[in-house]
Each structure stands twice: as C-alpha cells, then as structure tokens.
Regions:
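Glycine-rich, low-complexity intrinsically disordered segments
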Residues: 1-141
C-alpha cells in the first residue's frame, strides 16, 4: 500500500511507503493500601508515539532533503536562529475502497538517508518524530 504525503499544503512528489502508525501507553501497577493492600490495579501512564519512516524512490524533488536541512543546517558563518521546523503532515493511504487519512501533529525529521537497493534503484528515507496523530474524518474513495 502506498501513501500520499503532504505538508505546508503541498503534496510531496512520488509514491511513498510508510512505517506503521503506533500509539503506545505504558502501564503502572498501583496498590490501594487502605482497602486491599494485596490487590494490584493496572492504570495507564505515559503515552508515546514512535517515529514513522517514509520511503520513496530518489528523484528530482528535494522536499525530504530540504526539510531535514532545516533541522540540522550545515554551519557556515554565524548560526542563525532555527526556523520552525515542525509541520503538520497528512498521510493519505491509497488503495481499493474508502481509506482514512491521518495527520501527524508537530512532526519533524530526525533522520534522512539515501539508500542503494539491490535492484539498482536509489531510495531516500525520512524518519519523522511526532507528538501524536489523529484520524481525519474526510475519508477518500
């Protein structure tokens, strides 16, 4: 299944493959020492969203590289104040039937790689760290 990716209102060129969207909540065990000191209850604790990886064929579009360069610019001369590199990213899964769209909240690139595949095609990979995601109600057909 491929994914169409957009940020800043622009669709990024080329079909992408995306890693899984996951939300993980850690569990804490607590005891109520007054009522039953030997009974343990499990409650939710901190929720984390692991990074997602976008993978696409290497082409002329420089959107992945340009965004990654905003986070860690190559220092030449005085280092300017970094721009706001966090973006709202929309992932639109393409396939058969009605598929949902998701929005990554405050996403930013943590890694950018250019990979040489055994089939001879170069690919680029962008790893996005984000603060969470939400499903958008307007599904596409």
């Amino acid at each position: 299944m491929t994914v169409r990716v957009s940020w800043d209102g622009l669709e990024i060129a080329g079909p992408c493959a995306a890693g899984p969207l996951r939300r993980e909540t850690s569990v804490v065990e607590v005891r109520d020492g007054l009522l039953s000191p030997w009974l343990v209850q499990m409650v939710p604790d901190l929720t984390r969203c692991p990074a997602i990886t976008l993978d696409r064929p290497l082409g002329a579009d420089r959107a992945f590289l340009a965004w990654a360069a905003q986070v860690a610019p190559f220092p030449v001369g005085p280092v300017p104040e970094p721009p706001d590199f966090r973006k709202e990213v929309t992932l639109e899964f393409t396939g058969v039937g009605v598929l949902p769209r998701y929005r990554l909240v405050a996403a930013w690139p943590a890694a950018y790689e250019v990979l040489d595949q055994p089939d001879g095609l170069a690919r680029e990979r962008l790893t996005l760290v984000h603060e969470g995601f939400e499903r958008l109600d307007d599904a596409v057909a």
